[in-house]
């Protein structure tokens, strides 16, 4: 059924515009970079190859460093104990540069933190990259998850349902990865 204004479509019995999500439930907040529209932030922890290990959902206005502990505690697989020979590294971007609070939360869980400091140059004086940035691994995983239509636009009112869909998509990513590796053997 066509609405009264140009570009507005209505579904019988509902007053939504085309392109809007169906509901806005819990764990939704105003996005500080998108004219304060409601949005969802997905904090995700991935391994070195991009396999998702933990996912946490919050409102778009929640800072990254406040979700760090919940993300690290949400790992669903048993991880090996770090040792002197095989330490576990955790690379974080500038959003986690909040001083001793973040470093302590990371160190308590047995990780060696690598936090890019605000204002820190990426290049050494000779112009060479000492440690190449690895944030693209997380961005690639978020891109893979965004291919799932139910995750890209949030239609669920309850955050637990939305988180469940994200976890199903993560399982699908692991399945595809395992299937691809089995074909190479």
Question: Where are the regions that the model predicts?
Answer:
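Short, conserved catalytic/metal-binding motifs centered on acidic residues
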Residues: 10-19, 44-50, 68, 87-98, ...
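Helix-centered, glycine/charged polyanion-binding patches within enzymatic domains
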Residues: 80-159
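Short, catalytically relevant binding-site loops at active-site mouths
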Residues: 19-20, 59-63, 75, 96-99, ...
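C-terminal domain-tail junction helix/linker
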Residues: 164-185
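Active-site- or DNA-interface-adjacent structural scaffold in DNA-acting proteins
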Residues: 1-32, 46-48
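Active-site beta-loop-alpha junctions of metal-dependent nucleic acid enzymes
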Residues: 56-81
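Short, flexible loop/turn motifs enriched in small residues
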Residues: 35-41
